[in-house]
């Protein structure tokens, strides 16, 4: 039988108050065109509206590339991470949790009235990036000395939240979404590296650079290359290269460069392997 009927753009089913029963949260537009999250609870076999809260994105921004992620706060409380994408370029993320039985937006700015979690969209969404059981929000940051308009120049800081809405950076990554991989940036790298991209028919390389105290120019530290084409097996074992992974006919290789040798934050081949990951299909797909 029918329990309720409502218009919506996306929805989530999750036990937000940890009572063993799952609540239904639907995202819709109100009469003024604003985005609203409605939380319904089941009472006597009927879904009843418990509370509502405004969200920071329009339903158009949510419906196209947006996503609703059921996740967990640093305080081990369940939460909904609502991501909308404005103009295909800016990611806006709200973090919704129940406080005293009321749906609350933990990242709402008292000054602007919308989420403080806004940054360049890089086709990644909230997830547990490090396997600690807590959901992190991706926040893009321009690498030092780089043009903010260049997607290649963005690192991703992964931010966790507690029940009071306090943010904490957990780690930073460099995501090469176009080529299907990301690297967890080692200690000391996030504020000290920038990147360059080079392409040829069978090789696409990302080179990490740092500044040198002995030279005015930047020096290369690490290069990660995606090899395709018929010569990839031979090219993968070229002197200095080490294999990081394989996927769909592509071999990913690393190469430690001269800037790594005497640098305070130098890395080993094994450390690069441990920090390298392939991007799964779930990264770039929105859902309910």
Where are these regions (language model features)?
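Beta-propeller blade termini
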Residues: 9-16, 63-73, 121-131
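Surface-exposed loop/turn elements that mediate protein-protein interactions on large endomembrane-trafficking
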Residues: 1-4, 38-58, 94-113, 158-168
């Amino acid at each position: 039988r029918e329990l309720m009927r409502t218009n919506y753009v996306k929805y989530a089913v999750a036990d937000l108050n940890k009572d063993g029963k799952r609540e239904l949260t639907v995202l819709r537009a109100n009469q003024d065109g604003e985005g609203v999250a409605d939380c319904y609870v089941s009472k006597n076999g009927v879904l009843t509206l418990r509370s509502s809260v405004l969200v920071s994105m329009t339903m158009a921004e949510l419906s196209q590339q947006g996503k609703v992620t059921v996740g967990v706060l640093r305080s081990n409380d369940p939460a909904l991470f609502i991501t909308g994408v404005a103009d295909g370029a800016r990611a806006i993320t709200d973090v919704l949790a129940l406080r005293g039985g009321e749906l609350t937006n933990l990242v709402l700015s008292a000054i602007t009235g919308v989420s403080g979690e806004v940054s360049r969209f890089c086709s990644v969404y909230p997830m547990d990036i490090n396997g600690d059981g807590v959901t992190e929000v991706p926040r893009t940051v321009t690498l030092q000395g780089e043009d903010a308009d260049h997607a290649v120049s963005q690192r991703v800081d992964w931010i966790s939240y507690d029940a009071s809405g306090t943010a904490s950076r957990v780690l930073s990554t460099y995501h090469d979404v176009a080529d299907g991989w990301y690297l967890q940036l080692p200690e000391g790298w996030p504020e000290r590296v920038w990147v360059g991209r080079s392409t040829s028919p069978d090789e696409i390389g990302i080179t990490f650079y740092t500044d040198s105290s002995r030279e005015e120019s930047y020096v290369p530290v690490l290069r990660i290359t995606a090899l395709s084409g018929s010569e990839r097996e031979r090219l993968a074992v070229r002197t200095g290269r080490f294999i990081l992974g394989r996927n769909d006919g592509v071999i990913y290789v690393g190469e430690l460069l001269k800037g790594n040798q005497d640098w305070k934050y130098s890395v080993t081949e094994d450390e690069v392997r441990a920090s390298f990951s392939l991007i799964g299909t779930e990264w770039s797909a929105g859902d309910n």
